[in-house]
């Protein structure tokens, strides 16, 4: 009894065997109307769970259908000529592969109580490479292109619990955007990669040692690009430990009718992706739809107004807000800092710019489920604890924020603060954010805009940012409005040239991303809004979860509630006033920030940002 005959029996479809057909690596030239697929055969008792498992992990396991003795797979029954590319199936007993069979005659009785699943294998990376004008690379071995087991877990359903399997192609860095456009044109969202960059971020130790197939060699100018692989089904079969199961071996497929309806439905303009570098060490790129990216750019333009006429337009760098937000979107744990003691003759010396933006960002990070903490000056610890407590009491925050201090004296102290047990391979935080935080100048002092040295009021939190530059996996963002804030070292040349007193006050400490705003609080609000846009974007959201598990957009309602609002920010500023925190420019204890009244200026900015964020994409 041949495999093709059993498929015919199980699926009640006409199946004719091509027993001598060669292994086909590139399916782009297959017979029109047919597409390649892989087969999984499981006991009927496991069928509902496996169907749910595939539906919960659509990226690696796009299920075309299933059939049993009393059911016909619609896609297969529509055609009388279903051809078997490889007349082979792997046999599994209790999760162990016991061999490859070309005849299942001895299992004909068991097959009556089994269900066959057909998994779509039609997306061709080679076709996308060809369309993008990227030459194919030769394999280092005779089999199909390599696939790798990752440490990324698929969504667990009943007894199906396994890692995601991915396939990789090396792509020249300057061809990444073109490749993503080609994959979108061919297959829409289903053709998008789930990781671009360092394989270690997927738990892959060596690209030269694939778990399946042959290695495709990378060149120095290449970036590894990874797609979910249907070979994940083999790991699923192993994990369920069924007493008997069968599955297509790697590289072996059957041909089924093409699913033209689903292919056409996914080709939508709003899904056209952009790719952006968000980290050099480790190398990491993220993707987002073009419309979502444009909305974030609109936020960046909105906050770039210069109400104080300081000349901040000279400090602007394109897409810093977008790249900072993309990096934050991938982070699991974020450390936020704020505090600029410009009023050194008053108690407290802090200003009203900074804490509201920091709290607004922290609130949204919490809504996304990210671990969030704050680090402040020891001198101001009690003040910030009261601010957070009052923010929770008045509904500005839902969850307490751990508040830390740092008074280390060396880079070793800073590394110990950032890393578990001082191990650079185990950072406590993925991303550091400074919002209106006093920044160290080139001479080691800290200056306000009037060139007054306030070093005696500032703890060396800058050292944490400097130490992070040498720890792989930690990124940083600085938000400022005058160039003397922590992180603005990235634009210090422009600060020295264009900002009043810039030659003295310019911060010398650089962040990976420098977000420039007319008022720093606006930068914090804009980061929260940008994170909402990104996580509401189907392209980015799928990339974040590696195309496994359910969509995270189910939390969208709680995200809306976590966005800044005029009501919440009015309460937040009121809390600062109650604690005698003063406006930065005027020194007034009142409802203003940087000398600008809340209701006339800041409330309008919040409305603009949130309105642009929540409008339909």
From Swiss-Prot:
This protein's GO CC annotations: mitochondrial matrix; mitochondrion
Keyword terms: Acetylation, Lyase, Mitochondrion, Transit peptide
SUPFAM superfamilies on file: PSTPO5379-like
Keyword Protease on entry: no
GO BP terms: glutamate metabolic process
Residues recorded with modification N6-acetyllysine: 93
Keyword Transit peptide: yes
E.C. numbers: 4.2.1.48
S-S bonds: none
InterPro entries: D-Glu_cyclase, D-Glu_cyclase_mito, GLUCM_C, Putative_hydro-lyase
UniProt transit peptide range: 1-26
Phenotype on disruption: Accumulation of D-glutamate in heart. Mice develop normally and do not display any visible phenotype under normal conditions.
Substrates-to-products reaction catalysed: D-glutamate = 5-oxo-D-proline + H2O
Location(s) in or outside the cell: Mitochondrion matrix
Gene3D superfamilies from the UniProt entry: PSTPO5379-like (3.40.1640.10), PSTPO5379-like domain (3.30.2040.10), TON_0340 (3.90.1640.20)
Gene Ontology terms, MF aspect: D-glutamate cyclase activity
Family: Belongs to the D-glutamate cyclase family.
Functional description taken from the UniProt entry: D-glutamate cyclase that converts D-glutamate to 5-oxo-D-proline.
UniProt name for this protein: D-glutamate cyclase, mitochondrial
Origin species: Mus musculus
This protein's encoding gene: Dglucy
């Amino acid at each position: 009894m041949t495999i093709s005959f059993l498929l015919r029996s199980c699926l009640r479809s006409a199946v004719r065997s091509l027993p001598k057909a060669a292994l086909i690596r590139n399916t782009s030239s297959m017979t029109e109307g047919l597409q390649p697929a892989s087969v999984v055969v499981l006991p009927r008792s496991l069928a509902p769970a496996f169907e749910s498992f595939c539906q919960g992990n659509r990226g690696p396991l796009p299920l075309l259908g299933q059939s049993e003795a009393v059911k016909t797979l619609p896609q297969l029954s529509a055609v009388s000529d279903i051809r078997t590319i490889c007349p082979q199936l792997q046999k599994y007993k209790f999760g162990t592969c016991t061999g490859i069979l070309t005849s299942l005659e001895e299992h004909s009785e068991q097959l009556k109580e089994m269900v066959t699943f057909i998994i779509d294998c039609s997306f061709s990376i080679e076709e996308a490479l060809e369309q993008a004008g990227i030459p194919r690379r030769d394999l280092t071995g005779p089999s199909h292109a390599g696939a790798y087991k990752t440490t990324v877990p698929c969504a667990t359903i009943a007894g199906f619990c396994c890692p995601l399997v991915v396939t990789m192609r090396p792509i020249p860095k300057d061809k990444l955007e073109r490749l993503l456009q080609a994959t979108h044109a061919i297959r829409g969202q289903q053709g998008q990669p789930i990781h671009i960059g360092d394989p270690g971020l997927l738990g892959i130790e060596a690209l030269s040692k694939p778990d399946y197939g042959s290695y495709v060699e990378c060149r120095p100018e290449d970036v590894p690009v990874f797609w979910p692989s249907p070979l994940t089904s083999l790991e699923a079969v192993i994990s369920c430990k069924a007493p008997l199961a069968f599955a297509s071996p790697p590289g072996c497929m059957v041909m089924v009718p093409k699913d033209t309806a689903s292919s056409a439905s996914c080709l939508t303009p709003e899904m056209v992706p952009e790719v952006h570098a968000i980290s050099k060490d480790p190398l990491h790129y993220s993707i987002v739809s073009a419309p979502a990216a444009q909305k974030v750019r609109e936020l960046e333009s909105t906050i770039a107004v210069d109400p104080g006429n300081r000349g901040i337009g000279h400090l602007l760098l394109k897409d810093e807000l977008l790249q900072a937000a993309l990096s934050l979107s991938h982070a699991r744990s974020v450390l936020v800092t704020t505090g600029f003691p410009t009023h050194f003759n008053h108690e407290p010396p802090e200003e009203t710019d900074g804490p509201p933006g920091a709290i607004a960002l922290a609130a949204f990070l919490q809504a996304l489920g990210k671990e969030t903490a704050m680090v402040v000056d020891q001198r101001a610890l009690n003040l910030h604890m009261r601010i957070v407590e009052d923010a929770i009491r008045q509904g500005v925050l839902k969850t307490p924020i751990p508040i830390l201090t740092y008074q280390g004296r060396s880079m070793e102290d800073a590394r110990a603060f950032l890393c578990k047990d001082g191990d650079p391979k185990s950072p406590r935080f993925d991303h550091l954010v400074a919002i209106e935080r006093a920044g160290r100048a080139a001479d080691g002092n800290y200056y306000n805009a009037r060139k007054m040295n306030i070093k005696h009021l500032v703890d060396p939190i800058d050292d944490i940012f400097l130490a992070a530059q040498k720890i792989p996996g930690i990124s940083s963002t600085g938000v400022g409005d005058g160039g003397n804030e922590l992180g603005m070292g990235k634009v210090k040349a422009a600060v020295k040239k264009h900002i009043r007193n810039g030659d003295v006050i310019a911060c010398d400490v650089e962040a990976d991303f420098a977000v420039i705003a007319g008022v720093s609080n606006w930068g914090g609000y804009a980061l929260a809004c940008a994170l909402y846009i990104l996580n509401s974007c189907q392209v980015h959201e799928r990339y974040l979860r590696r195309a496994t598990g359910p969509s995270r957009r189910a939390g969208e309602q709680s995200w809306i509630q976590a966005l800044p609002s005029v009501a919440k920010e009015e309460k937040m500023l009121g809390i600062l006033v109650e604690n005698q925190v003063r406006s930065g420019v005027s020194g007034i204890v009142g409802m203003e920030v940087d000398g600008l009244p809340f209701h006339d200026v800041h409330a309008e900015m919040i409305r603009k940002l949130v309105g642009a964020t929540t409008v339909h994409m």
